[in-house]
Amino acid sequence: MADKGERAIKVVAENRKARFNYAIEDTVEAGIALTGTEVKSIRNGKTTIAESYADSKNGEIWLINSNIPEYLQANRFNHEPKRPRKLLLHRKQINKLMGAVDREGMTLIPLKLYFNERGRAKLLLAIAKGKKLHDKRESEKKRDWGREKGRLLRARG
């Protein structure tokens, strides 16, 4: 059994379509301000971040449209499933992210929601630019060609 100091990172939710729909420039790890019932619900593993994005309001970054379902045992003290959640970042990181969004037309999308070694909920946030339809087709062709090339190499030798 692992000791408390040797806890592994546990990925709870992953945005798999993000790498297909966006060209990812940079990633940042951010903490999330959560209530107790939200943490318990995340640990149950029913969270989705596929349709969510991050936006800035009043000099802070907020995670919008993420779905953390209600915790069944919480009764009336439950949280709202799709409420905006504040992301915990340093001021320099916030300025960098807001600058990229304002100047370069980038978007902030979550890639992974996980618990780190200390048991804290963290979000891997990406600065990304949306791909056009022809870019998506091109990346799909590259992926298919890579698979086909691997098959050919395995078949010959």
From Swiss-Prot:
Residues 133-157 are annotated as: Disordered. GO terms for biological process: trans-translation. Residues 135-151 have a biased composition (Basic and acidic residues). The keyword ATP-binding does not apply. Pfam families: SmpB (PF01668). Belongs to the SmpB family. This is SsrA-binding protein.
